[in-house]
Amino acid sequence: MTNVTVRAMTRAEFDEWQTEIAEEYATEQIAAGRWRAEGAVERARDENALLLPQGVDTPRMLVLRGIDADGEPVGRAWVGLDHPRGAPDAAFLYDIEVLEARRGSGLGRALLEVVERAALEAGAAALELNVFGKNTAGIGLYESAGYEVTTQQMRKMLRGEPSSGDNEGAAKP
């Protein structure tokens, strides 16, 4: 097993990560048909700001940097110790990511395991997450790590592609 540890992100790492995660999350939401492209990055930033009002110092949030045995960064993770839908004793994994240049070498599993330990040590009895349906690599990782589907959302477009208006999920005629 690849050796990975985690530590709290620095403020500089947090600021860089917030820019990247907002862009990634907006792209995922657009691809899933949940958001329109216009204003999506700003919306993602706003949502993250609500969840992390004190940034890296937000209580009950683990904002972590994964580090390999050589002290080099391998990825990041964000765990909320209070589940967003109130599930008792469950933390929520908002984000986990291995740096692109480091993917494919077992670091994802190693990072996930150390993040699970951090959540357990912080008092969580379970860890839940959301994974987008087209993220087959993530789905495979989570299933092989023992995660089970607890809820599932599905979508079928009835009238073409989502429009660029303001209503979430609306479709063009």
Give the predicted meaning of each segment.
Residues 105, 121-125:
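Short coil/turn segments at alpha/beta junctions that flank glycine-rich nucleotide-binding fingerprints
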Residues 99-101, 105, 133-134:
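Active-site acidic-Proline motif in GNAT/NAT acetyltransferases
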Residues 109-113, 121, 133-151, 156, ...:
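Conserved active-site alpha-helix within GNAT-family acetyltransferase domains
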Residues 8-99, 114, 118, 149-160, ...:
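Acetyl-CoA-dependent GNAT
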Residues 88, 106, 137:
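Residues that form or flank phosphate/diphosphate-binding pockets in enzymes
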Residues 93-96, 127-131:
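Conserved hydrophobic beta-strand within the GNAT/NAT acetyltransferase core sheet
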Residues 3-5:
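Extreme N-terminal starter segment of soluble prokaryotic enzymes
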